[in-house]
């Protein structure tokens, strides 16, 4: 069975709620300022200023100012004078009745793409679950109307600071890419030597090994620096939890998407201080 290929980030896509709550896909409408001069794309994070929606930069967090995620808008087209429903808000549109459709439930679980830089798709890993991640504030696509914001693949140990915008809840198995395997040779601190890799390893690649009985052993680590096909070594973010056995088979998987939630204190509904 062919699974979908993830070629680019798309911002935050709501899929569920935490705690087994019923997810109805409900949204709330907020006004967009007349002539608001910034594009807002489907999947962008937004906040409120004086009752109006504003697009937020999300790189390292926006403590207490997040209202939700933009999921389209409607407005009267100033040229045709017809009501228009759109995937994104075109900057500087002169419409006085513009409203944004926003997923504002602070318990929403989102799906998002992991990138190493700009829109370069990288990987998530099991070791990232429970950690906080920064995001990459990319410019969206006016042709599709979709956001291009992405999760930033961490280097070394994922950060724990509460200033970062999202918490990783899980992996998305539907789009995992099983890259293949290599034979383990040795390790020095976190640099692993192995047989020549027949494939490239993106940042964040999940690494495990096979036990003598055929069981899979998660390493609790991920690839820290991208490695090219043909390389005979790669660097982990940390030494594996369980040491690799001599000449064991190393297994590599790329998870381009992760499940995340807006961090506590980022969403204005979970912050006691009101917006300005």
Model-derived features: where do they sit?
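Surface-exposed, low-hydrophobicity beta-strand/loop segments enriched in small/polar/acidic residues
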Residues: 1-179, 183, 190, 208-221, ...
């Amino acid at each position: 069975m062919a699974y979908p290929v993830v070629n680019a980030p798309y911002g935050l896509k709501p899929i569920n709620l935490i705690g087994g709550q019923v997810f109805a896909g409900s949204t709330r409408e907020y006004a967009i300022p007349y002539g608001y001069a910034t594009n807002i794309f489907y999947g962008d994070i937004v906040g409120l200023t004086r009752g109006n929606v504003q697009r937020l930069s999300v790189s390292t967090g926006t403590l207490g100012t997040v209202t939700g995620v933009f999921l389209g808008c409607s407005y009267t087209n100033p040229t045709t004078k017809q009501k228009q429903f759109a995937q994104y808000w075109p900057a500087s549109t002169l419409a006085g009745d513009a409203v944004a459709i926003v997923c504002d439930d602070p318990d929403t679980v989102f799906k998002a793409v992991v990138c190493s830089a700009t829109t370069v798709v990288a990987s998530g890993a099991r070791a990232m679950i429970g950690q906080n991640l920064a995001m990459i504030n990319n410019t969206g696509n006016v042709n599709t109307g979709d956001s291009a914001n992405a999760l930033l693949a961490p280097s070394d140990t994922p950060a724990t600071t509460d200033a970062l915008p999202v918490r990783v809840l899980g992996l998305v198995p539907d789009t995992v890419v099983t890259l293949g395997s290599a034979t383990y040779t040795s390790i020095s601190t976190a640099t692993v030597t192995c047989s020549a890799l027949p494939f490239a390893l993106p940042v964040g690649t999940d690494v495990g090994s096979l036990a003598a009985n055929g069981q899979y052993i998660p390493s609790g680590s991920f690839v820290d620096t991208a490695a090219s096909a043909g390389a005979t070594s790669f660097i982990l973010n940390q030494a594996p939890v369980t040491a690799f056995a001599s000449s064991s088979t190393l297994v590599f998987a790329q998870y381009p998407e992760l499940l995340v939630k807006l961090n506590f204190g980022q969403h204005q509904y979970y912050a006691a201080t009101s917006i300005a």
